[in-house]
């Protein structure tokens, strides 16, 4: 029986490259001259530091642009509330990896509501979809791509 897996992963190497490129852009931008601002990658989290809230917003936009250039989906970003310590502002940006249980249940419900002849099962942090016809699986992929669940999904391990 044909099957595929639905996963939600980000490429950590591309994330590191995007953060490095964003830091490089900060050093060349005129509006960030003589400003203590930086991106710091800690595991799969990015710590953004700047001297003001407005600069934090600009830095998030810079990071989004570099993520898009490196083909990392910005929907995986989860920006925490900014914190003020003295004159510096800090913000942690978390990147979601894996599919949590409520999102997996929404995926399974979405697949069942589409009335396609496929079965979906939750297997840890991924969802396995099996069906008799390859066309049904491709219709399932199209339905999931149309749905906005606030998280990027990849489809891998497609088997006939």
UniProtKB/Swiss-Prot annotation:
InterPro entries per the UniProt record, alphabetical: DUF520 (IPR007551), UPF0234-like_C (IPR035571), UPF0234_N (IPR035570), YajQ-like_sf (IPR036183)
Keyword entries, A-Z: Nucleotide-binding
A GO MF term: nucleotide binding
Gene Ontology cellular component annotations, sorted alphabetically: cytosol
Role summary: Nucleotide-binding protein.
Entry's family note: Belongs to the YajQ family.
Name of this chain's protein: Nucleotide-binding protein VP1617
Organism: Vibrio parahaemolyticus serotype O3:K6 (strain RIMD 2210633)
Origin organism lineage: Bacteria, Pseudomonadati, Pseudomonadota, Gammaproteobacteria, Vibrionales
